[in-house]
C-alpha cells in the first residue's frame, strides 16, 4: 500500500531490504550491489552512511534477468561467485546463504539454488528434478502443467552463480516472446544443458519465504522477525 518502494517498507522496525542486506553481510559477502529503479533515493536513504554498498539503476523493468544484466559493467572485473537475491524477502537467514556457499564450493558448481518445500506452492516457480534427483529446470507457475503444479518444491529466489558463467548465459538469453522480459530462472537450466553442474539445497524453511503483499502478511512476518530477535 502507498507509493513507497516495497523493499523500503518497515517490518520489525527495519526496512525489508535492510534485513536482506544484513543477512548477506553476516554470510561474509565481500561486495554488495543493489539494483534500484523506482524511487531509488528512498532505497539509498536506508543505507545512508554505509560505504560497503554499490548501486546500479535498472531504468526499465524488463525482468529478473535484465535486473542482473544491468550489473554487468559494475562486475566486469569480478571473477568469483555471486548471490542473486530479492530485496523483499526479509526472513532470509545468513545460515541458508552459508549452506549454499559450502555446497557450491564443494561441488565446484556453476549455480546453486536453495529451495523450499511448502504446502501451497501456488505462484512459485517449481523445481524439476530428473530420475536421479538432480536439477533439471525451474518452471514458472503460469507455464507449469497440472502435474508440475503438484510439485511442492519451489524456488524462492535464492541463487548463487559463478558470475562469469552467469553473464555469459545472459548475453544470449532471449526475452520471453509474450512478456518481453528476460527471466533469470532460465539460466540454471541452460547451464545444466551445457553440462555445467547445478546444485540444489533444500534448505529454506517454509516460513522464510512468506510473501508480503498485504497488511496481514506484513503483520505475520513482523511477528516472526520479532520472535527471532
Residue ranges of model-derived segments:
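Short aromatic/basic micro-patch
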Residues: 10, 91, 160, 211-212
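A short, conserved acidic/glycine-rich loop-to-beta-strand motif
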Residues: 106-117, 125, 136
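His/Asp/Glu-rich metal-coordinating catalytic cores
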Residues: 82, 87, 95, 114, ...
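Conserved beta-strand segments of alpha/beta enzyme cores
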Residues: 7, 52-54, 134, 197-199
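Catalytic-core segments of class I nucleotidyltransferases/pyrophosphorylases
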Residues: 135-208, 215-227
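Conserved N-terminal catalytic core of the sugar/cofactor nucleotidyltransferase
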Residues: 10, 14-85, 91-102, 106
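N-terminal nucleotide-binding beta1-loop-alpha1 segment
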Residues: 1-3, 32
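Structural beta-sheet core signal
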Residues: 33-34, 83-84, 111-114, 200
